[in-house]
């Protein structure tokens, strides 16, 4: 139930009401501050008999009791949007409450996390549909803002059940609506006598919790007297959430997890724990914070200078187990503000590696099926893989797993720990038995060491440093799948079919020996930052190795950003190893023009760019250009460049990309001394649902269907290029699973004939769902109607209801009534008292051009029913 108030009238039209309702009601507040005030109609109009029955105002700013959909907040934490029953009350529920008190039942008490068993009075009222929370729970407060439809509840921490921050009960998770889904991407290139096209699709069906998906691609090439065309089925699978197990089930094509073993493709069944189903504060690893408060105190925990946790603790020992650090490294600074003014401060060192879990947390991952790879050199043996990780006391994590196949057996055991000031570390051992393509049998071990450490004082962050050593007889499941002991995997393209591109080389006689991986960054404060990332893999029986490193420096100066990087790539069995050094500079135009940046100015959103590269073969290239964004929504990007290369002389390009409401369209023109070519790209999504078909930009894994019937051309806040179609439907992409997603219509883009009860909605989608966000729209005219009866205005303060739509309003000065969303013709029921003679009916007709006008002003005559 939603009773229209002045907040339903857009601000840009409130001028219509100045001197109507509120010019007369301006004198009311001085009376409303007293309970049971009496309104003398003579104060409002000289003729008091022309005023409706005002007894409903005599108890202050009271609103009708009923069911209202409100945003529910508990202790400043958003719980969700919910329909709640409100009753009239004389108790203090806030100055803006409209004299309403929410009714709490057991379901709502559970929703807000109240420990009902701790309060005997609640136990006695468990069957009561309208429990008075203020009387049942000491120190609880309720503040209801009727205009904002926001209910704020404050409950002492001791009265709440122990639950993690950010916890959303599974009852609120939305499996979505039945739908047909299609994601498509089509690209083409024409130049130098050649044509090439590529099309990919990801299609699916959603029915309840089940998701059916298929991924495929099509390649086409024609040129130089050669023609090729091929369709590839990349994968087909069915997926659903198993909520009681907090896990996901996948049947069909997929990939195993990579927490413990290296990830591989499979065609079979996988059941695995889903981190997404846990609150942010229970994902990954964070240390348990313990301490002792001398008094009732405020506890604050900071990481890297940012507050990540704040709560109130009772006197005595406390334990915090639901932290959600903002990064994987960075010591935790704990502050306890005692009630007597004293303060405790201490630091808990913190770093993590990927396998660390919180105490009491258990994760599993089970897979059974055929090995699946896009590499034609490999077969498809059946295998089983099972892994488990468990968080133990003292910040330990134990983990293990196994891989079983006809020609392969592997077992892994490991242990990880947060070492405080020394960082975080994990160590595991894998023992494997293998039979290779030549029928030879091997047995070996592999030891893996991972380390992470943040030294914020020096600005150094070892994001991940790893080392693995394997004995000569150690092989992986991926190795055993090869059909031959040695071979190449090629990628043929139509134009250079005689010169295939080598994408993979394997030689099982050279088993892996040791591998070092590193990812380190170093902050230089105002002077930028340095980083180094890379891996180095050695093999048995050869001096060759795989090496990839990238070292770089990034910084900025007066708005100009620049970077210098060096990369080194070298692979066993693959020629054309290369080393490249590159320089990149980007200069915003407002720096060149010395203008103050404004996002609305296209010139300020433009920038100049320059990059130069040199490789180990002595080849140089440079490119200078300009780019930026255009259009009101900044959804048209462009870039134009010109440069020179050692091989092809001059070179240049011009590209543009438009993120439209129904898809993405891009195009480009490239040229150099020897050739010219044109390329294009078209991508988007198609959603079929019970209300029709909706086109969109490329879909994400999880999406929201926006339903605002009749509200066409309305933008969605914080969504580039997305607006509702002519029917009022749109798709918001890449929704966050198992979390509240806020969807808001931009009311500034609504037409004159569109009104919406509430322009904000929130949903909690499950993995892969298409969730619908409904908006209650009113499509019609905004009208100011002067209603008269017997040649005189109907009484001031009369209630007005449009018969066909149920729109309600109130009579202001001189019989004027403001309506929004009114039909072009209708019937108004005007009532100013309880008797049959205290009502009349007015018929009205609006001109068709009213739909294009801000407000239409007309008159209507009101007659008694039956007259």
UniProtKB/Swiss-Prot annotation:
PANTHER family: OUTER MEMBRANE USHER PROTEIN (PTHR30451), OUTER MEMBRANE USHER PROTEIN SFMD (PTHR30451:SF6)
Disulfide bonds: 840-862
Keyword set includes Signal: yes
One GO CC term on file: cell outer membrane
Compartment(s): Cell outer membrane
Biological processes per GO annotation: pilus assembly
Gene3D superfamilies: 2.60.40.2070, 2.60.40.3110, 3.10.20.410, Outer membrane usher protein FimD, plug domain (2.60.40.2610)
Signal peptide: 1-35
SUPFAM superfamilies in alphabetical order: FimD N-terminal domain-like
Phenotype caused by lack of the gene: Deletion of the operon under classical laboratory conditions does not result in any major effect on E.coli capacity to form biofilms compared with the wild-type strain.
Keyword vocabulary terms for this entry: Cell outer membrane, Disulfide bond, Fimbrium biogenesis, Membrane, Signal, Transmembrane, Transmembrane beta strand, Transport
Keyword Secreted listed: no
UniProt protein name: Outer membrane usher protein SfmD
Anything else known: The operon is cryptic under classical laboratory conditions, but is functional when constitutively expressed.
Protein family (similarity comment): Belongs to the fimbrial export usher family.
Domain of life: Bacteria
Induction: Expression is negatively regulated by H-NS and subjected to cAMP receptor protein (CRP)-mediated catabolite repression.
Membrane topology (UniProt): Multi-pass membrane protein
Main location, first listed in the record: membrane
Pfam hit, one: PapC_C
MF terms (GO), sorted A to Z: fimbrial usher porin activity
Annotated function: Part of the sfmACDHF fimbrial operon. Could contribute to adhesion to various surfaces in specific environmental niches. Increases adhesion to eukaryotic T24 bladder epithelial cells in the absence of fim genes. Probably involved in the export and assembly of fimbrial subunits across the outer membrane.
